[in-house]
């Protein structure tokens, strides 16, 4: 049996002489374990020798390595160039970003500078008591309040102008003569004619008149020569003639009493005219000054800062049917100075003192 098996194995193509002396069971065990061997283990023999396929691959790699090196070098150069291009583009992008940031910063800086300049101008245009602090919110709030008050003043003036237009349309006035008439400051009572007693009449008849005119034959002030005897005349007739002459505007006869009293009368008349032209009203709250200047009236008020006081004064002037031509509002520290230019008409029935008292009541 042992001799037959080796003969059979020798005839086989896959005979292995190294296994000639082994037992059959060892051969079977080796065949059964061959299925469990991994492909990598099967490709590499146990003795560590390399297969023919691996040798061919190594030879191909050794033969083609310079080309691959060139390709690798070329690919590396291309990659380096791409990286450099990418770095250049990144640098350009960074530069552009930096320029954009700088431009944004400069634009924002210029905008803030212009805003500060505009706020400074706004603060200088309005009275200082409208702004309590110097921040932007306080300045803008004060501007809004000041503009709203000016709008109210404008609306009141427009309403007054419309009322005046309607009044002129409904009741047209007579066109005055081209000759300028003297301005009427305030209505006054006509001066009373002086009363003359009988003693003054007799005294006037004795003295010549002081008028520069030459006595006429029909003049009641005819001079009588002192050497001639006086002709007594009825006192009633002399009184009527003198009264008629005084009503016609002839100058009164000279008398010491009248000459002595004339300076006092003229001084009283001048003082009354001055009082009517200028009037002052002072109180703890405000000082009011009224001054007539031609056809206009200048009204000045000096007081502490009182919000809304200008509107009160304008309303009071409108109630008195006075036309406001100009309004000036000035402030110095905590003091407020208001000046009004007012046009008066013929229908005005107020004197300067009464107007000053009316304006003084608005401060109460």
From Swiss-Prot:
Effect of a null allele: Stomatal defects in cotyledons and hypocotyls.
Regulation (activators, inhibitors): Negatively regulated through phosphorylation by the MAPK module. Activity is constrained by polarized BASL in stomatal lineage ground cells (SLGCs) undergoing ACD.
Biased composition range(s): Basic residues: 196-205
Post-translational modification: Phosphorylated by ASK7/BIN2 and ASK3/SK12; this post-translational modification inhibits activity and limit epidermal cell proliferation. Phosphorylation by MPK3 and MPK6 leads to the inhibition of stomatal fate and to degradation. Stabilized by CDKA-1-mediated phosphorylation at Ser-186 which promotes stomatal development.
Annotated phenotype, changing residue 219 to A: Ectopic stomata formation and increased accumulation. Ectopic asymmetric cell divisions, but fails to produce stomata, and reduced repression by osmotic stress (e.g. mannitol)
UniProt note on tissues of expression: Expressed in developing leaf epidermis. Reduced accumulation in the stomatal lineage ground cells (SLGCs) where BASL is polarized in the cell cortex. Observed in small cells of non-protruding hypocotyl cell files and of developing cotyledon epidermis. Restricted to meristemoids (stomatal precursor cell) in leaves epidermis, mostly in dividing cells of non-protruding cell files.
Source domain of life: Eukaryota
Protein role: Transcription factor acting as an integration node for stomata and brassinosteroid (BR) signaling pathways to control stomatal initiation and development. Activates transcription when in the presence of SCRM/ICE1. Functions as a dimer with SCRM or SCRM2 during stomatal initiation. Required for the initiation, the spacing and the formation of stomata, by promoting the first asymmetric cell divisions. Together with FMA and MUTE, modulates the stomata formation. Involved in the regulation of growth reduction under osmotic stress (e.g.
Protein name per Swiss-Prot or TrEMBL: Transcription factor SPEECHLESS
Organism (species): Arabidopsis thaliana (Mouse-ear cress)
The organism's taxonomic lineage, starting at the top: Eukaryota, Viridiplantae, Streptophyta, Embryophyta, Tracheophyta
Gene giving rise to this polypeptide: SPCH
